[in-house]
UniProtKB/Swiss-Prot annotation:
The active site is at C245 (nucleophile), H330, E332. SUPFAM superfamilies: Carbamoyl phosphate synthetase, small subunit N-terminal domain, Class I glutamine amidotransferase-like. It catalyses: hydrogencarbonate + L-glutamine + 2 ATP + H2O = carbamoyl phosphate + L-glutamate + 2 ADP + phosphate + 2 H(+). PROSITE patterns: GATASE_TYPE_1. The keyword ATP-binding applies. Residues 170-357 form the Glutamine amidotransferase type-1 domain. L-glutamine binds at S45, G218, G220, L246, Q249, N287, G289, Y290. The keyword Flavoprotein does not apply. Pathway: Amino-acid biosynthesis; L-arginine biosynthesis; carbamoyl phosphate from bicarbonate: step 1/1; Pyrimidine metabolism; UMP biosynthesis via de novo pathway; (S)-dihydroorotate from bicarbonate: step 1/3. InterPro entries: Anth_synth/Amidotransfase, CarbamoylP_synth_ssu, CarbamoylP_synth_ssu_N, CarbP_synth_ssu_N_sf, Class_I_gatase-like, CPSase_GATase1, GATASE. One of its GO terms (biological process) is 'de novo' pyrimidine nucleobase biosynthetic process. Residues 1-166, 1-169 are annotated as: CPSase. This is Carbamoyl phosphate synthase small chain.
Amino acid sequence: MKRQLILEDGTVLIGTGFGGEIEKSGEVVFTTGMTGYQETLSDPSYCGQIVTFTYPLIGNYGINRDDFESIHPSVNGLIVNEICDHPSNFRNEISLNDYLKERKIPGLAGIDTRKLTRKIRQYGTLRGRLCNMDADVEYIVSQLKATVFTDHVKRVSTKDPYPSPGRGHRVVLVDFGMKHGILRELNKRDCDVIVVPYNTTAEEILRLSPDGIMLSNGPGDPKDVPEAIEMLKDIIGKVPLFGICLGHQLFALASGANTSKLKFGHRGLNHPVKNIATGKVAITSQNHGYAVEEESVENTELEITHVALNDGTVEGLRHKKFPAFTVQYHPEASAGPEDANDLFEDFLTMIENFKKEGEELCQNA
């Protein structure tokens, strides 16, 4: 079955269709991960995107029940050079092709993914549509140019609060499109977690008496989530806070800094990040299309703690006065290296120190 990818600039790439027999549009991006395709397609941060894999063979270990980062996949399509039809792994339960058919997600194989990746790197991310061969190219191009992809966080965030009980510190996890890996890391440390929707107010969060607040990853432009920015303005300084990815960007906006869209984003499992204070470099998992503008941090109460070695963009922030820090990358990995996993320990240490300071103030009052 032939299928084509039509880009907003009129480029047409023809290959072999697999997965769902459905047409879908989305922002065409690329990821450099050699493995972790199951985590990628189930990562809510990819909501509404058509993901191109630069690694030439995808699907060789199939799909299993353990590696999902969300219950429902949020990607709008997959593009690969070659898909493996006969996966081999002791955990395999279903092939990638069959899984995409079940979930009605279209795929395209047999195209030059290196050519497509170079195009995205040169011109930036492009809107595109995976469609059948009888599609009207001119009409689709006109539709793509007029399309604006918004409200992704609203689509992937939980609709209702729910608990993930533990005996340790109570952490309110604000879900902007949370990967399950973040929740797993908190559960490992016996945190008493309450997951809340993206539009939960500061008053509602504080009513839960949290020891700490965690801001999850999520898709899209952080400026599309004004409710969260307003919530954070009222939260910062009252409770220890740790943010990841979109949570990092929202924290920056709430603190007076600015964000902007990257040309082609950071998506992959091998991005080097430097800790400015120690000089140490961690290899990190990343997935974001926006970043905090370095110059916008200068007139705020924030300091830059980490930078990307590939392009110098901001990868970490810390508040100068209050117990709050954030990172642009994914310390929980899932998939990817676990070089930065100790940030969860830093968060819990910050909570304990904040509690001790509060107890000392009460004793001295």
